Amino acid sequence: MVSQSSGRQDSPVDPWEGVSDDPGNTDGLPSLLDTEHPFCPSDIRFTRHRAAWINPPCAQQQLQDASPQVLAVGNRESHTASNTKSPLGTSPLSLGDSVVETSLPKGTTDSLGSSSAWGTAGNGSDSSVTLKEERAGLPRRCPHTSLITSSKTVSGPPCPEDGRAFFKPSQLTASADADAVQVGGRTVSSNSFSPEAFVLPVDAEKENAHFYVADMIISVMEKMKCNILSQQHTETWSTEEAGRSLGNSRADLEGTFYTHVKQESGSSTSSDSGYEGCVLQVSPVVETPTFSEVTEEDCKCDFDDFVIVELGDFSNTTEPCGCSSDTSKSVIHEPNFNSAELIAKELYRVFRKCWMLAEVHYQLTGSLDAAGSIVINEERVQKDFESSTDVVQEIKLKSRIRGTGDWAPPRFQIIFDIHPPLKRDLVVIAQNFFCAGCGTPIEPKFVKRLRYCEYLGKYFCDCCHSYSESCIPARILRMWDFRKYYVSNFSKRLLDHIWHEPIFNLLHVSHGLYTKAKELDRVREIQEQLFHIKKLLKTCRFAESTLKEFEQLPGHLTEALHLFSLEDMVKVKKGLLAPLLKDILKASLEHVASCELCQGKGFICEFCRSTAVIFPFQTATCRRCSACRACFHKQCFQSSKCPRCARITARRRLLESLPSAAT
């Protein structure tokens, strides 16, 4: 690094860094004995934080190996060897600071090495320094100092050989990531980090699974924040200013992304996620962004902070700047749009696109320095992605968030089958000698200590099975067996959770249970009567007191047929549910018999023409037509000659014949 003196022409160029012959002056600063160069109190070397000067030992060793050797030729002026500095000596910026390394062309390297000449005030030959600066890592605080992080071209006039002292470095190495420059017959590689430092542990994917999901969620949230900020800037700024800022930032975006890819090519693994190639995290910029750079930061948010892809089409993800204020594209209008499985699939699909595009962009940026250009067919990438295997299968193969390939925790599911009795050894072998609850490996000599769960049909360790007892739904539905069996802690929590839930429809699950359990069949008959009479009472304005009686029962017993919970079936077995249903039915029948509104809503049997009013809830003596839902006596009803169905058919034919007669 070279700093240019802009104050006086007679003052020689005072570089930042140098190598001194004085062993006491090892910090690379100008000698305190040199009174011609005043001390700059705002020098960035003194104002920068101390922690920024620390480099890893491998980087220090690399810089020490790359230190050039200084050749001193003559000394006829007042400058002594202690005041003479080499441009690439030991300094806080060279040894202690992790400065971003930048590739320099060969011509630039030669010019930089030849321009480090020292002139005298008597001859008046000042070194002219031409700086081409693309970006500055830190703001300038001192007029004598500058920090340049990109390529520089330094040229100086030829120094006459009449005794002037000059310093010429024998080597100058500047590389970025995997590049190496061969200078002075020696090849120096800047990638001195060992490959073992980036090798993940064997179980890193399993241990960091929650980080994997957390990074996905955080990335999507950061994308939403970026969209909101971009929308706010668009509303406040004018169209011309926004267009000018976007036009200026597009070129900077390409250069910045190229620099970031080169810097991160050695270590593309996120330090906290445990998986490779998913997130490119870059240290934040120190300088305060100006008004014209806000739009640039918004457009570069996908590359500076995290690689985030919008939940849209594949074509939208191929754009270099993925910032968009339209967040409605990521909204999925489906019945189960917020389910965990669907969200995981969507996140995996989007991030898989992101990984593929990251590789494409890396090849594109690498082709800028290559002799031949690399042609990337993005249509082929899209076709390969669409023709890949199912997303669900890829999730199972690449990352099993629920356990491992040999073990998975039990699922929250209702089991309606009774497990056949099997030998303990066979069941444990089927479990791969793992505890079904926590996945703890079990040695063969401790197999006898495992505890069996009657609900799941698997063996658990002592920590996952505390000998809790519960009724098994499959045994109740198949055998009307209410005995309690030992279940695991997981099964106990599951059964307690569904204990009051009406999820068992006996008509579909176990229709033959009514013939096995007589008390259940009697409850079904009363339930059917209450189902019809409750509908009638809801239409009567005088049945408020009677409807309050139904509040003693769960709503599903009087509003749906054949629907029970485990608690209801236990009450049926104990004989507690049938008496309660009979009391409510008795009160309802008394109201219907004495209410004129309810009597007016009854039916008259059209077969026997009896004056007695009949109702659908009288299931013992009445029957309803399945087509017109009319009510008749059971002994009088004939489905093939329903009078109401005949009238409806005749009326329909009459209506169909009227338009044809009018025409």
Curated annotation (Swiss-Prot):
Signal peptide: none annotated. It is found in: Cytoplasmic vesicle, Autophagosome membrane. It holds the Pfam family RH_dom. Residues 1-36, 65-136 are annotated as: Disordered. InterPro entries: Autophagy_HostDef_Reg (IPR052428), RH_dom (IPR025258), RUBC_PIKBD (IPR048569). Its main location: membrane. Keywords: Acetylation, Autophagy, Cytoplasmic vesicle, Lipid metabolism, Lipid-binding, Membrane. The keyword Glycoprotein does not apply. Residues 80-93, 105-130 have a biased composition (Polar residues). It comes from the Eukaryota. GO terms for molecular function: phosphatidylinositol phosphate binding; phosphatidylinositol-3-phosphate binding; phosphatidylinositol-4-phosphate binding; phosphatidylinositol-5-phosphate binding. It is a peripheral membrane protein. One of its GO terms (biological process) is autophagosome maturation. This is Protein associated with UVRAG as autophagy enhancer.
